[in-house]
A protein has these predicted regions:
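Gly/Ser-rich phosphate-binding catalytic loop and adjacent alpha/beta segment
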Residues: 13
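Membrane-interface interhelical connector segments
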Residues: 49-68
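Non-cytosolic membrane-interface motifs at loop->transmembrane helix junctions
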Residues: 16-27, 98-109, 135, 165
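Hydrophobic cores of alpha-helical transmembrane segments in multi-pass integral membrane proteins
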Residues: 1-10, 29-48, 69-93, 106-160
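Short acidic alpha-helical/loop segments enriched in Asp/Glu that coordinate divalent cations
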Residues: 53-58, 90-101
Length: 165
């Protein structure tokens, strides 16, 4: 999806030499996106397995529900650590590139919202034992915010704001 949108809405290239933090920031961001994407896929499989279990359907040979849940939260936990590191690297990178550490733009706001959603999810899981569809909904909300942080911010900046201007 990201590649397709990059082809349809090409942007300006980033200058990697602008900051030594940029390659680290990009690598951490890509890794965190990958982990959260894996978490979303596992959450969808978990929802399917839970739905089959509630309907009394035969087991389709997939992973057991508890295994899917455990894997989903491992992906979320690892993704959260990398997203936190991504935001920290971006904070340092922003200081060097923009002259201030935090720029209030679409990318920053959506990234912060996704971080908060994942923090709430992990806190709720550890403190209150959130499981099943409640946890999956919060995961999906965080993933949507994360998707909007990159793809959405480019779409807003390059398509919507360009049409208004």
């Amino acid at each position: 999806l990201a590649v397709l949108l990059a082809v349809v809405f090409p942007g300006s290239p980033l200058h990697v030499d602008a900051s030594p933090w940029l390659p680290l920031h990009l690598a951490l961001g890509i890794a965190s996106y990958g982990l959260f994407a894996a978490a979303v896929v596992h959450a969808a499989l978990m929802s399917h397995a839970e739905r089959q279990m509630r309907q009394g359907a035969d087991h389709d040979g997939g992973l057991p529900l508890l295994t899917l849940e455990r894997l989903t939260f491992r992906f979320v936990g690892a993704g959260f650590v990398l997203l936190t590191a991504t935001l920290a690297a971006g904070w340092f990178f922003g200081e060097q590139l923009y002259g201030k550490s935090w720029v209030w733009n679409h990318k920053s706001v959506f990234s912060l919202h996704s971080w908060i959603a994942f923090a709430v999810l992990l806190f709720g899981r550890n403190r209150f034992g959130w499981r099943g569809q409640s946890a999956v909904r919060v995961l999906y909300i965080g993933a949507i915010f994360l998707l909007l942080a990159y793809v959405g911010s480019r779409f807003v900046a390059e398509v919507l704001l360009e049409r208004i201007a």
